[in-house]
A protein has these predicted regions:
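Nucleic-acid substrate recognition interfaces
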Residues: 1-239
Length: 239
């Protein structure tokens, strides 16, 4: 049986690659916003004509040619998905608004597809369109067939890559053995075989730290340097 599995790693691009990643993020965001604006204008004026394609936008804005063309195509598909969800919620009585993408978003990302082995992993490097081989912190092996990757950048100026692969999953053999599990407060669980599993309370401790950091953030003045620094601390706890 096959299923999709994602492998996420910290990217370590060089300075030139950072510039191109930032440019790709900006171009995808620009194209999404331009198409959304065009779509809204046509909707208000009841214009049924088709939207301009990313190829037509490249003629108007030549600097769009500098980045991965597949990433731009995916940005257009993201807008289509957003509009489909918008009308689906509208029909079900859940009015919502389509928002423009902001460069001030704490996390920006773009997605690209593996076409003719354009994306591949070699040791601790991954080959990406336009970027070439980019180093990453290889914490585990990437298995299966690479379908797509998502490159992201967070508020801490850290770059990450999520590699989506199609992997073969082995079906576990059926067993007639049974075990009872009792979840508790002091111990995480106790089995019918009298096995005790301790409760490290990682989630509880993390939630307390996050709550304290968010409380401090709420007291910081909007737009201030101290608020921006506190936002980074909150985001670091979310990682």
């Amino acid at each position: 049986m096959k299923q999709l599995k994602a492998f996420k790693f910290r990217l370590e691009p060089n300075q030139q690659q950072k510039v191109l990643i930032n440019k790709t993020l900006g171009c995808c965001r620009f194209l999404y916003n331009q198409m959304l604006l065009e779509k809204q204008t046509k909707y208000k004026s009841k214009d049924d004509s088709k939207l301009k394609t990313e190829k037509e936008y490249k003629i108007e804005f030549e600097w769009l040619k500098e980045v991965d063309s597949i990433a731009l195509q995916q940005s257009r598909l993201d807008l289509k998905t957003a509009y489909d969800n918008f009308f689906r919620k509208l029909k079900s009585g859940q009015p919502t608004n389509l928002k423009f993408k902001s460069k001030h978003n704490p996390k920006n990302s773009y997605r690209t597809i593996n076409v003719n082995n354009s994306i591949r992993v070699e040791e601790n490097r991954i080959k990406l369109s336009k970027l070439g081989f980019v180093k990453f912190r290889k914490s585990r092996e990437v298995s299966g067939t690479i379908k797509s990757v998502t490159v992201s950048k967070n508020i801490l100026n850290r770059y990450y890559i999520s590699v989506l692969c199609e992997v073969e999953v082995k079906t576990l053999p059926t067993s007639n053995s049974k075990v009872g599990i009792d979840l508790g407060l002091k111990e995480f669980c106790i089995t019918s075989d009298n096995e005790f599993v301790s409760n490290p309370k990682y989630l509880r401790n993390s939630e307390l730290k996050l709550k304290k950091a968010q409380r401090k953030l709420s007291k910081r003045k909007k737009g201030s340097n101290r608020r921006f620094k506190q936002q980074k601390k909150v985001f670091r706890l979310h990682e």
